[in-house]
Amino acid sequence: MKKKTKKVEPIQMNTSVKRRKFLNLRMPKSSDHFLHAAMIILMLFGIIMVGSASMGVAGGNNRFLVITIVKQVVYAVAGYTAMTFLANRFQLKKLKSSTTFLVILATIASLLLCLLFAETNGARAWIRIPLGVTEVTLQPSEFAKIIAILVVALYLGDNVHSYSKRFDLIKRPLFIDGVILFIVWILQSDFGSMAVIFVIICVCFLVPNHLQLRGYQRILTILFYGVVLLGFYILSPSGEHLIMKMTFLKTYQIKRFISAINPFMDQYGTGYQLISGLISFATGGWFGKGLGNSVRKYTNFPAASTDYILAIVVEELGFVGFIGLLAVYGFIIFVLLRYAMKMRSEKGRIILVGTAMYFLVHMFFNIGGVTGLIPLTGVPLLMVSAGGSSTMSIMACVGISQAVIASYRRGEIR
């Protein structure tokens, strides 16, 4: 007698295959593995430096130090999971307005939710979640940076030729990104995040090659150079008087401008952390004092693991460590821009350029603030500063970029 064999139902097979694909945490074969390796290096380096920089804040409290490191590891794992998930699941052709609009609404709702929580450093930009012995904070404005990039890609990429009027072309992205900027700057009072989002949007807006956009792009370019020149003038001794006339800035923001010009005017107040950071830079030398051997982190340096972590990096690893960190950032930006220059898909190019600018603008604002070249904005050093929102957000953004790169290398987009 022939043995009866059970037939596997096609539906069950399809379901199991889909489940394996959904839970797949490996990067696509067609993704850029060098970019992936650079992200892992930054992720591990960030965990190590957060642990080192937090020793001073812990003040011998080993429990606090362990909790801080564990939180950073959890954030890194969550970010890595988001990166691999999006690298496998994100598709440009499925970037449709209906789905994206729901994400936009959720982002705006979370931004408004921050207003219910207490103010920190002059801004209401965080959602605080008590979790046993610690507290988890989320900053929705970090995730809004991804949304801002996708909004420009959705409405200005590839399909813009169907519009007959110039304003019809930009009204939707202008409105959505305008609402995000309004909430972050006016309602949350988070000038640093607003500035980062604004610069990213402006650069992404310059990417599409469309006749009806060129007039707006020229105006935007002129305004950009004008703002840069005005900034240089304000931060010069002759332009210092203009700072006091900026009524749209809060008192603490005006003090940051003044501290950037001369931190010794308030060396025990707003200028204290900047002076401490500059001392760390000066004492680091070429090769630093060694990992974990920073002296300044044991002084009153509360932002040592966040805004000023670069000062601890330079003090412990020296100028060589600083150049090495810049090299990793530079490599990531180079890879993203190289693929953006190669491909014709404007949606893909906008996403890649936006992700590159995400890295570049954060680098500029953080390094500039720590060294006193520009006022401190509270913008973290991506993947290195303590905090989960910026780490998870940038890794998710790189995951989307890797999906675009993989599609390009497979020939699915040009």
Regions found by a protein language model. Give the residues of each.
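Alpha-helical transmembrane segments of multi-pass membrane proteins
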Residues: 39-55
